[in-house]
């Protein structure tokens, strides 16, 4: 079944979850991106269960936050964080477009990658350490949202190179069906989040959309289009910024009213 092969390709490429090994046939790759957000659903499910079980067992806020910070990296294998680090090095180099693309391919991590990843994990740890039941559900769902937006970019943005991971998937993908599937994911996730908290949903989605717009502008201006590393950069940045916006908004609401409404 071709759709099942597409599912295995998506999970084998973008996660550490063990799946049956399949040949990367073009017919299967056409729909692989359609299943990319499902990896976010797995991460979000494990994230929320860890939050719930951690508090049930009274593990303490620090240990729970450490576990929640680790889960996206452990399940994804760090592929998106690798792109974030490479992009930070390239952006911070202030070099030409061609030189930035070369830096993205460099397997070594520079000082800016290390510094910015440290700041990222510090902020992420702080963000998950103050989660409540409502915000934990919203942020768990955002693992799907970030991947749906990333999937849209893969088929809709121009690529910086004619080769590479994003170019390979874009050339093979059925753009119309991938776009429709990403929109469906977004609609379902937004409806789900609205049932939890309309205010936090609006705040989180507006932040995610701003990150998406910024991603396109940065990719086109500094690199001439998107790449696999830039896609990873957007994904982890979107999850962090949306998460911070959600917990800050929640804190303002609780502080201002004294209760949830």
UniProtKB/Swiss-Prot annotation:
Give the EC number(s) listed in the UniProt record.
2.7.8.26
Give the pathway: Cofactor biosynthesis; adenosylcobalamin biosynthesis; adenosylcobalamin from cob(II)yrinate a,c-diamide: step 7/7
Recorded catalytic activity of this chain's protein: alpha-ribazole + adenosylcob(III)inamide-GDP = adenosylcob(III)alamin + GMP + H(+); alpha-ribazole 5'-phosphate + adenosylcob(III)inamide-GDP = adenosylcob(III)alamin 5'-phosphate + GMP + H(+)
One cellular-component annotation, GO = plasma membrane
- A Pfam family annotated for this chain is CobS
GO BP annotations of the record are:
cobalamin biosynthetic process
Q: Where does it reside?
A: Cell membrane
- InterPro entries named among the record's database cross-references: CobS (IPR003805)
Task: Name a GO molecular-function annotation.
Answer: adenosylcobinamide-GDP ribazoletransferase activity
Specify the superkingdom.
Bacteria
Asked whether the UniProt record includes Transferase among its keywords, one would answer yes
Membrane-spanning intervals of the chain: 31-51, 59-79, 125-145, 183-203, 240-260
Membrane topology (UniProt): Multi-pass membrane protein
Cofactor(s) the protein requires to work = Mg(2+)
Q: Which UniProt keywords apply?
A: Cell membrane, Cobalamin biosynthesis, Magnesium, Membrane, Transferase, Transmembrane, Transmembrane helix
Which of the seven top EC classes does this enzyme belong to? transferase
In UniProt terms, what function does this protein have?
Answer: Joins adenosylcobinamide-GDP and alpha-ribazole to generate adenosylcobalamin (Ado-cobalamin). Also synthesizes adenosylcobalamin 5'-phosphate from adenosylcobinamide-GDP and alpha-ribazole 5'-phosphate.
Family, according to the entry, reads as follows: Belongs to the CobS family.
Q: Which PANTHER family match?
A: ADENOSYLCOBINAMIDE-GDP RIBAZOLETRANSFERASE
Q: What is this protein called?
A: Adenosylcobinamide-GDP ribazoletransferase
Q: What is the species listed in this Swiss-Prot or TrEMBL entry?
A: Lachnoclostridium phytofermentans (strain ATCC 700394 / DSM 18823 / ISDg) (Clostridium phytofermentans)
